[in-house]
């Protein structure tokens, strides 16, 4: 989807995948010849902070997730997020991000284009993101809710 867009923005595909190396090899082959697309292995520390802090948009095109920690992290850094419309992602972002239909490359392309062409909307989502996620998933609140769950007969 990204290769179809005319933009000077970069796409950083960070981290590994849980499936296999074959998937990453397929992605690398699809990205061949496009110097806007960069691959990293697993990132943490200062590099992770740098990527989150400077991202225009965080994209999570998952088909299957548990509680997507990378999504929580991205939002805590105040990123505008674009996620597939699977329940695990939509339950996290509610109306504070952009969704696309799972597995629909054309819809992903359309939403990427929207984000690139509407920086004011992206800025609005960035402003909504951090406070919301840090309040909703604050450790003390999560611990209290978990404790109540275990104490319920």
Functional labels for PLM-detected ranges:
Residues 10-25, 41-42:
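Glycosyltransferase donor-sugar binding loop
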Residues 24-46:
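Nucleotide-activated donor-binding/catalytic signature segment of Leloir-type glycosyltransferases, i.e.
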Residues 42-43, 50-55, 146:
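Short alpha-helical donor nucleotide-sugar binding micro-motif in glycosyltransferases
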Residues 61-63:
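Aromatic "clamp/platform" in nucleotide-sugar-dependent glycosyltransferases that forms part
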Residues 80-83:
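Short hydrophobic beta-strand element within catalytic cores of glycosyltransferases
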Residues 98-105, 114-119:
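Conserved acidic donor-binding segment of nucleotide-sugar-dependent glycosyltransferases
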Residues 114, 121-135, 145:
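A short, well-ordered alpha-helix in the C-terminal region of glycosyltransferases
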Residues 139-153:
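C-terminal alpha-helical cap of glycosyltransferases
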